UniProtKB/Swiss-Prot annotation:
Subcellular location: Cytoplasm
Organism, as annotated: Neurospora crassa (strain ATCC 24698 / 74-OR23-1A / CBS 708.71 / DSM 1257 / FGSC 987)
Subunit and partners: Component of the large ribosomal subunit (LSU). Mature N.crassa ribosomes consist of a small (40S) and a large (60S) subunit. The 40S small subunit contains 1 molecule of ribosomal RNA (18S rRNA) and at least 32 different proteins. The large 60S subunit contains 3 rRNA molecules (26S, 5.8S and 5S rRNA) and at least 42 different proteins.
Protein name in the entry: Large ribosomal subunit protein uL30
UniProt function note: Component of the ribosome, a large ribonucleoprotein complex responsible for the synthesis of proteins in the cell. The small ribosomal subunit (SSU) binds messenger RNAs (mRNAs) and translates the encoded message by selecting cognate aminoacyl-transfer RNA (tRNA) molecules. The large subunit (LSU) contains the ribosomal catalytic site termed the peptidyl transferase center (PTC), which catalyzes the formation of peptide bonds, thereby polymerizing the amino acids delivered by tRNAs into a polypeptide chain.
Any single biological process term in GO: maturation of LSU-rRNA from tricistronic rRNA transcript (SSU-rRNA, 5.8S rRNA, LSU-rRNA)
Keywords (A to Z) from UniProt: Cytoplasm, Ribonucleoprotein, Ribosomal protein
Amino acid sequence: MSTSVPTKNDVLVPETLLKKRKSQEKARAERQAEIEKKKAANKEKRAVIFKRAETYVKEYRDVEREKIRLQRAAKQDGSFHIPAEAKLIFLIRIKGINKIPPKPRKILQLLRLLQINNGVFVRVTKATAEMIKIVEPWVAYGYPNLKSVKELIYKRGYGKVNKQRVALTDNSIIEENLGKYGIICMEDLIHEIYTVGPNFKQASNFLWPFKLSNPTGGFRTRKFKHFIEGGDLGNREEHINALIRQMN
């Protein structure tokens, strides 16, 4: 009796194995389709982000040009150009917790200035102006320019995600937490803060208080005197930008 090895065609593939293969092929196709879909969405999103960034650059440039134009016009007329009141303040806590009365202590907590060298962006309102006046003996503050806002957020920016401090390494972190307010990337976040936009509160609350370094060269010898008396405390207006550079 002769025996022969069965050919490939003679061996029937079990139905369960066929179903498994079909299922795997379907899953593979679905995964690939999902990857392609994400690629297309990311490409579209990058284009949107790039377009927004271009728009912001033009907006910032136009505002600066208008300011220069008004200054020149005032100079020609022999008058003074009075700039618009600042809407944004950057506050830095530079004094510790010793001998703080309950009221300023509470306000420092509300402002999230819990440690020395913590910094936060604050919208200028009547209420915040009153609060700042009370905590002035513990803080340095002033009006940050665009360069300062950008450098702070890019270099020291952390977001509050599920009560955790998370580095802003990816635009997706911003989109997941602020996307519902139309803020989907770093440039959106910077724009919202710098222009004190309609969703400033959500944007500034998302940003974890900045942890700054001691200034290069140290604070002034009379650190706890007011800025106008040769110290570091209180309102230094545009001069806050120099301090930010030193501490960032």
